[in-house]
Amino acid sequence: MKKSYRVKREKDFQAIFKLGQSMANRKFVIYHLKGEHKHFRAGISVGKKLGNAVTRNAVKRKIRHVLMELGDHLKSEDFVVIARRGAEELDYQAVKQNLHHVLKLAKLLEEGFEIEKKS
């Protein structure tokens, strides 16, 4: 994901947490806030309770990859994805389905967009 698509500064994270709305499912929480940018900006937070650094980085890579795939269909808002316990056990397809679900609940995806389900 390009740097312009990332929420990096602590000030931005705090603004999203304080002023934004949240939506959650069993594996992920999303806080979102209208931004001034022409595209979405995403921050990813994976706590130490999920495992060691290797495990946490693997979860972040999966989330980042899903967001890159869905990028054309995301609304231009700033949001933070927080991984909950159990997210480290998910494979890529499960991460994609769970993130799609919570993004849809938060109304961050374009109307009518659905991911293709592999059988």
Swiss-Prot record:
Top EC category: hydrolase
Gene3D superfamilies: 3.30.230.10
Catalytic reaction(s) noted: Endonucleolytic cleavage of RNA, removing 5'-extranucleotides from tRNA precursor
Assembly mode: Consists of a catalytic RNA component (M1 or rnpB) and a protein subunit.
NCBIfam families, per the entry: rnpA
Membership in a protein family: Belongs to the RnpA family.
Protein name: Ribonuclease P protein component
Native species: Streptococcus equi subsp. equi (strain 4047)
Gene: rnpA
